Amino acid sequence: MAKVLVVEDNPANMTLATFLLESVGHTVLKARDAETGVGLARSERPDLILMDIQLPGMDGLSATGILKADAETRDIPVIALTALAMKGDEERIRAAGCDGYIAKPLSYKDFLETIARDIDKRGTGARTDIPALKI
């Protein structure tokens, strides 16, 4: 299974992302702000980073830029978590260095398919099938 860093300041979104990731066996690292997320990415070297765009203090796009400029973290895929759905937002997100994005509110299937695809690209050997979620 993969180690996934979730950088999200909204407690409900953090709880949901953690639940979904852990339900398929991933280990979740949590950060509530960009600065903590950058530090955890450098120290823990996760297989994937889920980065909220709208964070207090430094925003998620700035944090992604820092990670992509660092030789130690630039190869870690960063997926933006965003409620932004305006024209041009995807281009702005990708220009900042994000490898993809997931729109909020989170959809179980879309969320885990995106995670599985990006983990599989990295070659971690993590399980990439999406089991039925039993609640």
Where are the language model's segments positioned?
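Conserved acidic carboxylate
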Residues: 8, 32
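Short acidic/polar segment at the start of the alpha1 helix of CheY-like receiver
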Residues: 10-14
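Charged docking surfaces used in two-component/phosphorelay signaling
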Residues: 15-23
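Active-site residues of response regulator receiver
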Residues: 52, 82
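The feature encodes the CheY-like receiver
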Residues: 56-59, 74, 86, 104
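C-terminal output helix
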Residues: 106-115
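The C-terminal output helix
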Residues: 116-132
